[in-house]
Amino acid sequence: MRTVSGFGRQVGKVLSRVRPRRSRPVALVASETSTVERRPLVSDRLGEQRHAGAVLDQVDGTTCGSAVLVALAAWADPAEVNRLETPAGGKSLVGAGFGSRYDARQKQVHGETNRFWPQALGTTPWGAVRWLRDHAPAAGRYRVRLVDDTSAADVAQVIDAVGAALASRPVPLLVGSFVPRHYVLALRADGAGWRVYEPTSGQVRLLDLAVVRERRLAPVLGFDRLHAALLPS
C-alpha cells in the first residue's frame, strides 16, 4: 500500500505533466566555493555521538527534525557550533552548559520551522527547507523530494539522487509508517549503504540500501518506509 507521501508523489507527477517546472540552477554550497574549516557536531563515525560530554540526541519526541537541522547547520557553518559552545555574553566554554544550550537550540529551531503547523506534530519537510534557506544559507538550498516506495523505479531514482548529493553535503531523510514520522540525516555513502545520524538514539548507524528497497528500515531508523529526501535544489 502506498504511503501518504507516495500518493503525494503520484499527484505531483501528474501536475508536473500539466504544468512542467522550469529548471533552476543548482545552488553551490560552501564546500564547493570556498575552503571552510568544518566543525561538525555530528561526525560520520559509527556509534554514539557526543560533544562536550553531551549525547547529541533529540530533546523530546517532536524535535527529530530540529536535531537534524541543527546538525546540518553546524556542518555548514562553524558559527553554529560556536553559538552552542558560548554562553550568552561570555567567551567559549566548551562543556560548560553545552547540553542545555543544545536542547534549547533544538526548541528554538522547532518554533522557527512551525509557524503555521502544530509543534506537537513535528516539522513538515517544507518547513525544514524554508528554515535552511532562511537560517542556514551556507548549507545551500534544498527541495522536498517525496518518495513512492511502492515503485522500484522511484526508489532507485531517489537512491541515486541522494548518493550523488552525499558527495558534497548531508541529506535529511524523512521516514515513517503510512504517515511520515521521523527525520534522520544521511552523512555519506559507505559501500552499499549510507551512514545515517539517527537523533532518537544520538547515534550514527549504517543503513544498507537493500532495506530501503525492501521497506524494512525499522531496525535501523525506527520506521520502515522512506517518505522523502531533502535534496539539493
Q: What are these model-predicted stretches?
A:
Residues L28-V36, A96-L230:
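Conserved active-site-adjacent core of cysteine acyl-enzyme catalytic domains
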